[in-house]
Amino acid sequence: MAADKVDPIHQFHIIKLVPINIGGYDLSFTNSALFMVATVVVAAAFLFLTTSSRSLVPGRLQSISEMAYEFVANMLRDAAGTQGMKFFPLVFSLFMFVLVANLLGLFPYFFTVTSHIIVTFGLAILVIGTVIVYGFMKHGLGFLKLFVPKGVPLVMMVLVVPIEVISFVSRPISLSVRLFANMLAGHITLKVFSGFVVSLSALGAVGVAGSILPLAMAVALTALELLVAFLQAYVFAVLTCMYLNDALHPSH
């Protein structure tokens, strides 16, 4: 148990809460699944409770909800134009899910679902899948113009087209790894400094004095992680908007 408290990786372990095995497939309900459900419930409850009154003079919480709505709406309009607003429910849902999941992960003993690559990759595949499906539905084979930039000489197409295809295919990887790596690294660093504080404090008066610097670093890192939680949600959402713009306007 003592090792678990110091081990910075222990916080990312998947724990089976309700073992479920169907046809040889492990479909157990885990701590990761629990906090994904909690993330959806918290985000939905916050938005419902803060906007249900629809007061002409909004309170603080209602103002936060309206600011989040306008923030994402403006982001989507800037990246994909007014046509992009048809994707607002998707982008806003992704933004709120990533933001709330990141924030919940900062609470002690809570699980950070966005620190697992399988979760972030699933979100990225949802985005890229939407781009591909909508792109072909709207433009047919014209969607393939996305891989043929305008103004490129014909002789260069042999080189440019494969590069564009590889760039497109790598999008879900870069989108998911960026979020996963930032959350993983931040939480490990925070856990390490917190472990220093606990370990030094157990050494008596000298240890307590020596723990002041790690404690200050832990507090500063916590504040930084709050900023990172928002920035990563913003980056994920803004890149989603840019990718959706390719589905709307595949011609460069």
From Swiss-Prot:
Membrane association type: Multi-pass membrane protein
Main localization of the protein described in the UniProt heading: membrane
GO CC terms of this entry: plasma membrane; proton-transporting ATP synthase complex
Intracellular or extracellular location(s): Cell inner membrane
Name of the protein: ATP synthase subunit a
Function of the protein: Key component of the proton channel; it plays a direct role in the translocation of protons across the membrane.
GO MF annotations, alphabetized: proton-transporting ATP synthase activity, rotational mechanism
Keywords: ATP synthesis, Cell inner membrane, Cell membrane, CF(0), Hydrogen ion transport, Ion transport, Membrane, Transmembrane, Transmembrane helix, Transport
Protein family per UniProt: Belongs to the ATPase A chain family.
Subunit structure: F-type ATPases have 2 components, CF(1) - the catalytic core - and CF(0) - the membrane proton channel. CF(1) has five subunits: alpha(3), beta(3), gamma(1), delta(1), epsilon(1). CF(0) has three main subunits: a(1), b(2) and c(9-12). The alpha and beta chains form an alternating ring which encloses part of the gamma chain. CF(1) is attached to CF(0) by a central stalk formed by the gamma and epsilon chains, while a peripheral stalk is formed by the delta and b chains.
Disulphide bonds in the chain: none
Annotated gene: atpB
Species per Swiss-Prot/TrEMBL record: Mesorhizobium japonicum (strain LMG 29417 / CECT 9101 / MAFF 303099) (Mesorhizobium loti (strain MAFF 303099))
Transport listed as a keyword: yes
Spans traversing the lipid bilayer: 29-49, 87-107, 117-137, 146-166, 188-208, 211-231
